[in-house]
Each structure stands twice: as structure tokens, then as C-alpha cells.
Amino acid sequence: MNRYCFTLRVRPDRLGEYKARHQAVWPEMLEALRGAGWSNYSLFLSDDGLLIGYVETPDLDSARAAMARTTVNGRWQQEMSQFFVDLGHGHADDNFALIPEVFHLEDQLARLRHRPGNTEEAFHV
């Protein structure tokens, strides 16, 4: 499973409504995301409108393409596009900026555990 992080910018005057919409995402949208391979998907929103998303999926391009083929995603993206800054001509799911991962605790611990000469006792504090 691959981990992806992305950013978008929500209009500061629409933060409250954006949050409210995400407290009751349409059930068919939730099912479409799951069916398209989106897992452990979270959104974080700062007071200045910076939106940070995190998702795990085997392949983000495939997961995005699967969502693009659903009618519910088109409706959701159309509904939500009013909340974002500088989307141009597309929807949010076409315009987010990916952020490269630079650290993952479990990956580094796993590499340490598999180094020659390391024992499991060395990792208990």
C-alpha cells in the first residue's frame, strides 16, 4: 500500500460550510471511494484554508481514474468546487498538489530490524 499526501486551498470565507459538508459525506460517495481503492483517507483543514489530504492506495492514478468513472464523483466534485481557491477549469481531484513523503517511522524501524547483527532486544526501550 502506498501513502500519498496532497494539498489544496479552501476559500477562507467558506471554511465552516466546507467542514459541515464533510461531516455528512454522501454514503454513495464513501462507497465509491472505498470501491476505487481509497483507504485510510483523511482531510485536515487549517484556519487559513490550507487543506491537507492523506490517502493510502496501491496506485493513486488508478484510484483517481476509478473515481472519475463514477457519476457520484462528478456530482460531488461539482458541488464542492465552489469551496476551493484557484482550481482553474477542473475539479479539486484534478488540481491537488502532491507532497513527497520524507519520513515514515515504521519503514525505518523495519529497515533497522533487518540489518545484520541487530536483535529484537535492541528495539525495546
Which residue stretches match the model-derived regions?
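Intrinsically disordered, low-complexity acidic/polar segments
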Residues: L15, I52, S62-R64
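An amphipathic, aromatic/His-enriched active-site/gating alpha helix that lines ligand/cofactor pockets
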Residues: A36, T57-N95
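Glycine-rich beta-strand-turn "strand-cap" elements at beta-sheet edges
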Residues: L45-S46, Q78-V125
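Short, glycine- and small/hydrophobic-rich beta-strand elements in well-ordered beta-sheets
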Residues: L30-I52, E56-P58
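Short amphipathic alpha-helical segments
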Residues: R14-S39
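Active-site-flanking beta-strand signature of metal-NTP-handling nucleotidyl enzymes
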Residues: Y4-R9
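Short intrinsically disordered coil segments
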Residues: Q23, R69-T71, R115-T119
